A protein has these predicted regions:
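Active-site mouth of glycoside hydrolases
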Residues: 6-22, 26-285, 291-295
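Alpha-helical scaffolding within the catalytic cores
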Residues: 6-9, 42-48, 293-309, 340-348, ...
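Acidic (Asp/Glu)-rich catalytic clusters
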Residues: 48-53, 179-180, 304-314, 348-355, ...
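Aromatic- and acid-rich polysaccharide-binding/catalytic face
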Residues: 226-254, 305-336
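Substrate-binding cleft of secreted/luminal carbohydrate-active enzymes
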Residues: 315-323, 329, 340-407
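Extended, alpha-helix-rich binding/interface surfaces that flank or overlap catalytic cores
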Residues: 372-459
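Solvent-exposed beta-strand/loop surfaces of large extracellular or lumenal domains
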Residues: 462-473
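Surface-exposed interaction regions enriched in Ser/Thr/Asp/Glu
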Residues: 476-491
Length: 491
C-alpha cells in the first residue's frame, strides 16, 4: 500500500496523487464484565472484506487507554495482538487505518457509562462517578468526578510521583512502536473529543443561560408559539428557530471564551507533547488533531497546528466532529441541514487557518426508517464540496444491510493525479461527475470507485475498468493527460 502524507490541504500518496477517503469507525469501547471491563476488538475478516467491497478505504480503529494499560506501565500485549490482527486484515483488503485513542466521559467502570482511562488514572479528588439518569453525556455537564478527572489530566497531576501525561505519552509510544511500519497505517488520533473539565461544566451553564436569554429577548424566537408547541406535544418543533445558523451561533458563542482558553492552553500543550512522544518513535503516520467536545456545536476551534518548539509538524491533519441535536433519536428526521451545515462551515474556517487536510472523524449517527437520510446526503455533499475525507460514526452489526448504505456506498474519487477541481453526485438523476487538473504526466492512473453497475461513462481521457470481486462495483482507472480532465458516470 502507498504511504499517505499531506501537502497543504490535501492528502497525497507516494505518486503525488490527491487522495480521498470514504471511511467508517470501528470502535471497541469494551463492555462491563463481572469485575472488569472486557475488550475484544470484535472485527473479523468477513466484515473487513465487505467494507472494502462497499467502497470503504479507511477505518478509524478505536481503542482505549484502559484496554492497553490496565496497570501503570504494564501493557496488554494480548489486546494489541487483536488490534494488529484487524490492521492486518485492513491491509489485505486495501483499507487504511488510523488509531483512535477513544474516550467518553473520561472513563467507564462497572455499571457506569463512559470509556477511556484506566481506573488508576482517574484522579477525581474524592468525587464519585455517578450512573447516568437522562442522557449519556450528562457526566460532562454536571458530573464532578468526570470534570475533576479531566482537570487533573490536563494539569498533569501525578500518580505515584509520575505525571499522568507521562504515562499517556509512553503508552502511545508503545502503541506506535508496534504499528509504526505497518503498510496500512494512516495515522494517530491521539485523543477523542477532548473535554475541558470543570470549565466544560461552566460552558454548559453558559449555554443554558444563553438559550434562556435568547428565547426571552430575541425577536426571532416567538415565545408564545414555542410554548404552544411544547404544550401540544411538538417539543421538537419548538427548536425550529435555532435552525437559523445566526441564532444558533448567538447561543453557542457564550462558550467561546472558555473553549479558546482550553484550545490554546491545556489542549495545545498536550497535543504537542503527545505528538512529540510518538515522533520520537517514528516519522511514519499522520498526526491527527481533534476539536474539543463543545466545538462539535460550532464553537470555534482555536488550537494552533502541532509544533515542536515552534517547528511545525510536517504530516498533520484536522479531524473535526459534528452532529445534529436530534442524532440517534426517532426525531432525527427533523435534523437541521442549515444548523449542522453552519457547524461544518466553522470547521472549514479552522481548516483554512491551520492549512491542513481534513478527515471528518465522526458524523452521521443512526435512526430508524429512511426519512432522515436526506440529512446524511446533505452532509456527504458538503464534505465532497470541500474535498474532505470522512469516517462515518459508526459500524454496528447490521449496518451493511441498513438503508443508510444507499448513501454510504457511493461512487467517489480515490486517487487523482493533480488537483481535484470538483466532484458531485446527482442522486435524483443518477449521475456522478469529476473534474481535475493534471499538472504533468504520471506513471499511474487516476482511480475512481464506482459502487454499482452503470449505464455509461464519458471521459476526456482513455480509461480501463477493474472489477471488484463479488460485487457489481468497479475501479475506473483514468489515463489522464496534463490539463483539464472530466469524467461523467451515469447509472
Amino acid at each position: 500500500m502507498k504511504k499517505i502524507t499531506t501537502f497543504k490541504q490535501k492528502f497525497i500518496d507516494t505518486h503525488g496523487r490527491e487522495r480521498i477517503f470514504n471511511g467508517v469507525n470501528l470502535c471497541d469501547k469494551g463492555y462491563n464484565g463481572e469485575e472488569e471491563r472486557i475488550y475484544e476488538m470484535p472485527f473479523n475478516e468477513e466484515l473487513i472484506k465487505k467494507l472494502s467491497q462497499n467502497g470503504f478505504n479507511l477505518v478509524r480503529l478505536g481503542m482505549t487507554w484502559d484496554a492497553i494499560e490496565p496497570e501503570p506501565f504494564k501493557y496488554n500485549e494480548e489486546y494489541l495482538d487483536k488490534v494488529e490482527k484487524v490492521a492486518d486484515l485492513c491491509e489485505k483488503y486495501g483499507i487504511y487505518f488510523y488509531l483512535d485513542m477513544h474516550q467518553d466521559l473520561y472513563a467507564g467502570f462497572k455499571g457506569m457509562d463512559g470509556d477511556g482511562a484506566p481506573k488508576w488514572a482517574c484522579l477525581t479528588d474524592g468525587a464519585k462517578f455517578q450512573k447516568t439518569r437522562f442522557v449519556w453525556a450528562e457526566g460532562y455537564f454536571w458530573g464532578k468526578a468526570t470534570q475533576r478527572a479531566f482537570d487533573n489530566f490536563w494539569n498533569n497531576a501525578e500518580y505515584n510521583g509520575i505525571p499522568l501525561q507521562t504515562y499517556f505519552c509512553k503508552m502511545w509510544q508503545h502503541v506506535a512502536e508496534r504499528f509504526k511500519d505497518h503498510p496500512a497505517l494512516f495515522g494517530f488520533d491521539m485523543f477523542n473529543e477532548p473535554f475541558p473539565g470543570t470549565d466544560g461544566g461552566k460552558v454548559f451553564r453558559k449555554l443554558v443561560g444563553s438559550v434562556v436569554k435568547t428565547v426571552l429577548t430575541d425577536k426571532r424566537c416567538n415565545l408564545v408559539w414555542m410554548a404552544k408547541q411544547v404544550l401540544t406535544g411538538n417539543a421538537i418543533r419548538a427548536l425550529e428557530p435555532f435552525n437559523d445558523p445566526d441564532l444558533f451561533r448567538k447561543v453557542t458563542s457564550a462558550g467561546n471564551g472558555l473553549i479558546y482558553k482550553f484550545d490554546v492552553g491545556a489542549y495545545s500543550q498536550f497535543i504537542n507533547r503527545t505528538a512529540r512522544a510518538i515522533r520520537n518513535v517514528t516519522d511514519n503516520g499522520i498526526m491527527i488533531m481533534e476539536n474539543s467536545y463543545y466545538s462539535n456545536l460550532g464553537i470555534p476551534y482555536s488550537a494552533p497546528v502541532i509544533n515542536y518548539d515552534g517547528v511545525r509538524e510536517e504530516k498533520v491533519c484536522f479531524a473535526p466532529h459534528a452532529y445534529d441535536l436530534m442524532v440517534d433519536t426517532p426525531a432525527y428526521k427533523y435534523a437541521s441541514n442549515s444548523r449542522v451545515g453552519s457547524i461544518f462551515d466553522q470547521h472549514r474556517k479552522s481548516q483554512q487557518r491551520l492549512d491542513v487536510p481534513v478527515i471528518v472523524g465522526e458524523w452521521g449517527g443512526q435512526s430508524e426508517g429512511t426519512d432522515w437520510l436526506f440529512h446524511i446526503n446533505f452532509l456527504l455533499d458538503k464534505f465532497d464540496k470541500n474535498h474532505w475525507s470522512q469516517t462515518y460514526w459508526a459500524y454496528y452489526d447490521g449496518l451493511l444491510e441498513n438503508p443508510i448504505m444507499s448513501s454510504l456506498n457511493r461512487t467517489t474519487p480515490v486517487a487523482i493525479c493533480g488537483d481535484i477541481v470538483e466532484y458531485t453526485t446527482d442522486r435524483e438523476n443518477g449521475i456522478f461527475t469529476l473534474e481535475f487538473e493534471q499538472d504533468k504526466d504520471y506513471d499511474v492512473p487516476s482511480e475512481v470507485f464506482i459502487h454499482k453497475a452503470f449505464a455509461s461513462i464519458e471521459c476526456t481521457a482513455d480509461y480501463e475498468l477493474e472489477a471488484v470481486d463479488g460485487t457489481e462495483a468497479s475501479i475506473l482507472k483514468i489515463n489522464g493527460k496534463p490539463g483539464n480532465n472530466k469524467v461523467t458516470v451515469k447509472f
